[in-house]
Amino acid sequence: MQGDVRLAVDQGARAIGLIDGAFEYVAPVWHKEILYGLSKGVAVFGAASMGALRAAECHAFGMIGIGEIFAAYASEIRVDDADVALLHGPKELGYIAITVPMVNVDATIAGCCTRGLISAREARHLKESARSLFFKARSWNAVVANCSEIASGRANELLRILRHNYVDQKNADAMALIDALRHADAYSPPTHFEFNRTSLWRDD
C-alpha cells in the first residue's frame, strides 16, 4: 500500500520487491516513493501485478522489471491495468483467487493453443469472451458460458482443458522476482535523475 516503499527505504532496506496491491479500496504504492528509493541507491524490483505496472512506468529511472507480464506492459503489448486484477477471498482463507485475471487467461489459452488442445478460432473467441467480462465476474465457467460461438457439446470439454492446463503467469512472475531478490546485491540502480521534493512529499 502507499507509503510501504518509503518506510522500507527509511528503515534501511537495500532491495525491495513489489508484487501486488489491493485494487479499488487501498491506495497503491506511489511512483514518487519508488523514485525516492532509487535515488537512495535501493534496488527496486517489480513483477506480476501492481509491481509489473510500476516497473513498466519507472523502468527508465532504474526500477527492475521481472517476468512476462512486465515485458508485455513495458513493450505496450498490454496497456490495460485491469488485466492483472482479480477477486480474491479474505485473509482467513489465504486470499484464495475467486476469479481469473486476464494475464492468466491469455497465458493459459496460448499454452493450450500451442499444444493443439484448442483451435485458433476457439482461442480467439475465448479471449474475446474473457475480455468482455468485468474482472470480478471472470471465472472459467463465465468465460465459456459467455462464448456463444462455442457449441454446447464442446463447452464442457473446453472447461476441462482450461482448468487442467491453467497457467498462473502472475505466480510464475512473482516467484521469478523472489529469485531475483536473492541476487539483489548484483544490482546497482543508476541515479541519473534528481529526486525533487514537492508539496506532497516532505522529509519529516
Report residues per predicted region.
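Accessory terminal and edge-of-domain segments that mediate assembly/interaction
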Residues: 1-17, 26, 31, 87-204
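Metabolite-binding pocket within alpha/beta catalytic cores that recognizes anionic/polar moieties
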Residues: 3-81
